Amino acid sequence: DKSSLEWISNFFIKAIGIKNKYSNKEKFFNNIHRSLNISNLNDFRMDIINKINSSKSFREKFYKVSKPLVDMVVGNEVVMQKRVSLSIQIPKDDSSLLPIHADTWSGVSPFESVIWLPLVNCKKTKSMFILPPNKTKKLVKIISNKKIKNSGDLYKKFKKDLHWIDIKYGQ
């Protein structure tokens, strides 16, 4: 649903609250990190999350954008969590990066599906990575045997096996 995607994109520009001095949305989102103070990143993120969750339309628009994929992957009998969350990664800022992980490691149901909606074209380290199934089995075995103590070491061990997803705006 292109109109819902545009609505979400415009919502974020307004929620961010920084004057858009760029000629288009893609340039705005690709350069917003230049206007952010990394030490205030979590406060910035929480402010946007609060705006998202205060919006009467955001969840509906988000669902409309993702509905074709959600229906295909999990069917049409779904429940959406009450609160939408947001992750922000800043270029060259290790403190904002998400380490190699599975949401189930922190108690999330293995039956939950997470939707990532890119507001710009993403590739390489601007994207998200996945680990092929055969390597995932190896990773699970290593974790089960407690051979690696933290996600940083886990990342180093599997870095060469990661597949970075190329994904376009709204895909």
Give residue ranges: language-model regions.
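Amphipathic, alpha-helical segments enriched in basic
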Residues: N37, L41-R45, G75, I90-D94, ...
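Generic, low-specificity signal for short hydrophobic/alpha-helical stretches with a mild N-terminal bias
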Residues: N30, I48-I52, K82, L97, ...
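A short coil-to-beta-strand element that immediately follows conserved catalytic motifs
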Residues: N76-S85
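N-terminal auxiliary "cap/dimerization" subdomain that precedes the catalytic jelly-roll/cupin core
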Residues: D1-E77
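Catalytic core of non-heme Fe(II) oxygenases with the double-stranded beta-helix
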Residues: S96-Y169
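Active-site periphery "cap/insert" segments of enzyme catalytic domains
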Residues: E60-K61, I88-P91, S95-P99
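Ordered hydrophobic segments in well-structured contexts
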Residues: S85-S87, F129
